[in-house]
Amino acid sequence: MPAKKEQIQLQKEILNQEMWDELLSLEGLTVIDVYQKWCGPCAAVLSLFKRLRNEIGDDLLRFAVAEADSIETLERYRGKCEPCFLRYGSGQLVNVVRGVNAPALLKNVERELKQEHKVLEEGVERVVIKDPLLAAFEAEEQQAAQAEELEKKRLEEEARIKEIKELGDAGEVSVRPVSQGTVDTLMHGRQDGPQTEPVPKEVTVVLIKPDAVANGHVDSIIAKIEEHGFEILTTEDKTLTEDEAREFYKQHEEEEHFEVLVTFMASGPSKILVLTRGDTGEGVVSEVRNLLGPKDIEVAKEEAPDSLRAQFGTDKKMNAMHGADSKETAAREMAFLLPNFSVPIVPGTGPPPTIEKTLALIRPSALKDHKDEMLQKIQEAGFEVCLQKMVQLTEDQAKEFYKEQEGTPHFEDLIREMTSGEVLALGLAKESAIQSWREFIGPTTIDEAKEKAPDSLRAQYSIPDTQVNVVHGSDSVDTAEKELGFFFPKQTTLAVIKPDAAGEHKEAIIEKIKEAGFNISLQRDVELNKELASKLYLEHEGKEFYENLIDHMSSGLSMVMVLSREDAVDGWRTLMGPTDPDYAREHAPESLRALLGKDVLQNAVHGSSNPEEAKTRIERLFPDVEVLPGGEVKDSVASISMEQSQVKGEGEEGGEEQTEQPAGEGEEQQAEQPAAESGEQQAEGGEPATETATEGGEQQAEQPPAEGGEKPAEEETQQTQEGETPAADEAQAEQTQEGETPAADEAQAEQTQEGEEQKPAEEEAAPATEETAAEQAPAAEETQQTQEGEEKKEETEQTQDAPAAGGGEEAVATEGGGEGDAKPEGGEEKTEEQTAS
């Protein structure tokens, strides 16, 4: 009982969080015995603490016992049976001792009490620590949490991929790991945008002092730092002047060793490091100080033998390293030592980065021996290869590209090198790509590159016996755009989202298209009939799978698009991936067909094979547009959506509106295209035009006259002239019945006059069509005579006068619309009209 009373008098008993907080609010050194409720405080140290109190007799020294089970702050100390003594200097942890080591306890308490007096009375910096054991536990927990989070993400990704696989339109999809953004984009057509407010990472500054630099410990210290998971953001060698050292350590100017410290820090070069950790850097200041260890080398060797100061320091002054003691101090020291350094922001915060594109050329000599190695280095440096092409330049092309260097000493050598073999042209993308690439390849002059940037591409892969370097890079945004256009001219291509993907994944595919840098110039939802589908796959006609392919393409809605970009044809085919989804999953796992394709027929997307094919098929599916030589798309109407509108009116005004409004493909060409032009196109069109005209004529011959009589006169007349091309839509049918035909009359009359001059050529181009049109004209005349009014009679006369022009126009309209094989039944006419629009 007396012993218990003595213990209570010597050590204040702390039983709850409130008492703990009150204890730590007191000034001075507090030695706390942390115990478990089931075993009680450590009785072995009572005599030692009593002796200390009696010998020292200092009011700033106090002792306490704290029950870990009832104090929230001590939660991590629960369940530990080893005696643990925490020492707090005015509420801040300054030391931890585990186990009963009387000499160490005695020595440490005396030293720490003396240091606390200096802190309180002289303003000396207090060294605050984190319990090393708890720090290790927290690091393990953090690693476990990160591993758990990664596993959770992996399982979520697998679940999402499984979800894709279970969808009817997705088929067998690769179960490779993909990013959250990729899955979200493919599944939902969305990506989470970055936050708008930038959050800087927490960083700290470390100086490797002159003694450690002189002793050759820099590389070993850096290796130790990296082993502990710290990221070194930048390094710099710096020799402080005495004035700089005095300013840097001004908080210590009242200490007796201050001048010695200043002289030492100015005695040789130091190594400055800026460190962070993880995505946010949170807690990096205290973690680095724990790694450095106590300032006093003897204490460090005794209490933290694995610390950097214990391993590399010499004495208290020459203790190898300096580390900032707070975030504020780190910011001040960084501004003093590295004023131009920009602290990185936490990923996912701040505005999205500005991505630039630049041109890179690998010249023939380096390409022949080092292609794969150089490409690997480029990708490892963070550049994304968006465009890639092997090019054999002619001398004229090389001189045109480098015309601004004409007259320089090495111009002829440069042209000789650029034409000596194939050049690899790359379109690279990265944040600040232009400047980053120029820094990566090094100075233009080889000697300068080897001296100032020995790790650069120009230094590593230089060509012997020449001053021509191995790589080229654009030097500005304007130059990059111009040079990319030289090697990767802007093109237009046709893209089709097939029925198996158009319903479920259309928006996701469009998002991927935009991410790849394509501009969608035109797009329409189209239900292809077999005739139009066959035009898309002419090259596969006769193959075993051809009929199944045509059946699939005409089985539902597709989306047809016109895409524009540098090297658009090859770029879209790369994004699509190989035709066989199984092969694509193995060789191009990020491609659309790898992710969404089922088999070679249901492989999600289609694209043109070359620019010429793209132009032909775009103009076939979008007859109201023209693909210009530079790849641009010219729309012949103000708005695509205007095609579906109906303009109703009477008289001359209504006729003019009707002429401008593209009610159908055949009508548009009939109203706007002269007969002479038709003849030329007919001749140039070659075999497809002839075949279409013939097929159209055969179908006209088979058409029963009685069926034509049941239709409005104007509609049948146009069918006669156009070889059954479905040029008349519902709007035109209504307009015809109401007598709105002046525009068509004017167009036909004009074509008749021109047709008199061009008639011989047109008769040679399409004899079958002309004969058919002549045979059908009487039937059309009889039908038109049933209409009331003088206007209808004039229409009939003009229709009879223009059989030759109608025949020529028919061939052109059929070729342009790609619908010469249409059946005359009304229901199918309507389907083809919807397809054309």
From Swiss-Prot:
Name the species this protein comes from. Answer: Heliocidaris crassispina (Sea urchin)
User: What's this chain's function?
Assistant: Probably required during the final stages of sperm tail maturation in the testis and/or epididymis, where extensive disulfide bonding of fibrous sheath (FS) proteins occurs. In vitro, it has neither nucleoside diphosphate kinase (NDPK) activity nor reducing activity on disulfide bonds. Exhibits a 3'-5' exonuclease activity with a preference for single-stranded DNA, suggesting roles in DNA proofreading and repair.
- Every Thioredoxin domain range: 6-115
**Classification via InterPro entries:** NDK-like_dom (IPR034907), NDK-like_dom_sf (IPR036850), Nucleoside_diP_kinase (IPR001564), Nucleoside_diP_kinase_AS (IPR023005), Thioredoxin-like_sf (IPR036249), Thioredoxin_CS (IPR017937), Thioredoxin_domain (IPR013766), TXND_domain-containing (IPR051766)
Identify the SMART domains for this entry.
NDK
- Regarding domains, what does the record say? Contains 3 inactive NDK domains that does not possess all residues considered to be crucial for the NDPK activity.
> Which Enzyme Commission number(s) are listed?
3.1.-.-
User: PROSITE patterns under this entry?
Assistant: NDPK, NDPK_LIKE, THIOREDOXIN_1
Question: Which family, according to the similarity comment?
Answer: In the C-terminal section; belongs to the NDK family.
Q: Which GO terms describe its molecular function?
A: 3'-5' exonuclease activity; nucleoside diphosphate kinase activity
Region feature NDK 1, mapped onto this chain: 201-345
Note the subunit structure.
Monomer.
Q: What is this protein called?
A: Thioredoxin domain-containing protein 3 homolog
Q: Main EC class of this protein? A: hydrolase
Please note every region of biased composition (Low complexity).
Answer: 671-707, 718-752, 766-787
Regions of compositional bias (Basic and acidic residues) in chain numbering:
820-837
The answer, when asked if Disulfide bond is one of the entry's keywords, is: yes
Gene of this entry:
NME8
Could you tell me which cysteines form disulfide bridges?
39-42
Q: Kindly state the tissue distribution recorded for this protein.
A: Testis-specific. In sperm, it is a component of the arm dynein of sperm axoneme.
Instruction: Write down the Gene3D superfamilies for this protein, in alphabetical order.
Output: Glutaredoxin, Nucleoside diphosphate kinase-like domain
**What's in the keyword line of the UniProt record?**
Developmental protein, Differentiation, Disulfide bond, Hydrolase, Spermatogenesis
Start and end residues of each stretch annotated as NDK 2: 355-491
Where do the segments described as Disordered lie? 633-837
